[in-house]
Amino acid sequence: MSQYVLHGINDVEVEVEIDMSDYDFQVKYELAFEKMAEEEKALQKVGKNSEITKGYCEMFNHLFDNILGKGISKQLFAGRYNALTTDRVYDEFLGICSAQVKSNTAERDKIINKYRPNRAQRRSSK
């Protein structure tokens, strides 16, 4: 697992483990997003802004807790519901995951290509 820092409310730094190439992490990631999709369907979309914001933030709190471990959302947000901070942390998290997937893919391709003959070399040998 790789250690990363997410920046929560009041610039608090929370160290988390993210490993997009690890099976157990992938399972937690996938299940958490499936649960989030269900929560989003039930999310109140009309009414008081304060209630909408609270529901929105709670949905992401559950996502972070389900992927990164119970209590992570409390560390990140200190029990507060701020939609902009939630969006920033989510963006930071997805950025880390995306960069890791790209890096893992590039490394895997490098390893595979090391043992795969070059297409041009195969053609010239015919």
What are the residue ranges of the model-derived segments?
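Surface-exposed polar/charged interaction patches
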Residues: 35, 39-42, 46, 70, ...
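Intrinsically disordered, low-complexity interaction/regulatory regions of eukaryotic proteins
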Residues: 11-13, 35-40, 64, 102, ...
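Negatively charged, Asp/Glu-rich surface segments that serve as flexible interaction/assembly modules
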Residues: 42-45, 49-66
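Charge-rich, solvent-exposed alpha-helical interaction surfaces
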Residues: 28, 32-35, 59, 63, ...
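Mid-chain, well-packed structural core segment of small domains
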Residues: 62-66, 70-79
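C-terminal charged interaction modules
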Residues: 74-126
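Short N-terminal mixed-charge amphipathic segments
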Residues: 1-50
